[in-house]
Amino acid sequence: MKILIDTSYFLPLIKIGIENIPQTILVNLLSKTSHEYFYSNLTIFELTAKGLKLSSQKNTISPQDIRIGIDAIQNDLRLTEKSFIDNPLIIELASQLKVIHSDTIDCLIFATAICVCDCIITMDSSFFDQINKTPSLINKIREINENFRFWFNDLSEDLKGLKSIDS
């Protein structure tokens, strides 16, 4: 299965903890070689932005911590970078997602996952809930990737698909 890993799971690599999630979740996930793992090029931007904010405001992490974390992602042979410009459908779908979700980067990352992978690992269950309340988006996502799945939080629960809608 092709899995896109959302930005939150990479935060420990730049010394930012994730509440209620084991710090080893990414290491444990990547040890499962039966899947292919991807990240969005926007994840690198998001990690840098979050890291610089903490570095400049609280001095809890350093620019070197950010660089080390990004290098770890980019040099890990188990991870493949995907760009939001790799497929023209990504921007089209992101535009439709933007109608229900205000975070443009989230929209682009989710659209990238839907267009080029089988699953997204994310902590953003509210975005999934918003999509599930929008029949036109459910139809569009199914048109692009009929069996796309979402996997949430600590990955202890089963993958979730979009709800069925009557045609």
Which residues does each predicted region cover?
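Short, well-structured N-terminal submotif of metal-dependent ribonuclease cores
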Residues: 1-42, 51-68, 161-167
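Ser/Thr-centric signal marking residues that sit
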Residues: 7-8, 43, 112, 122
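A generic structural signal for short hydrophobic patches within well-formed alpha-helices
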Residues: 10, 44-47, 127-128
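Short glycine-/acidic-enriched loop or helix-start segments at secondary-structure transitions
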Residues: 14-15, 48-49, 130-132
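Short, amphipathic alpha-helical segments that act as regulatory/interfacial helices
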Residues: 48-52, 114
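Helix-adjacent hinge/juxtasegments
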Residues: 58-86
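Active-site neighborhoods of divalent-metal-dependent phosphate/nucleic-acid chemistry enzymes
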Residues: 78-126, 130
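Acidic, PIN/NYN-like endoribonuclease modules and their adjacent C-terminal/linker elements
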Residues: 115, 119-167
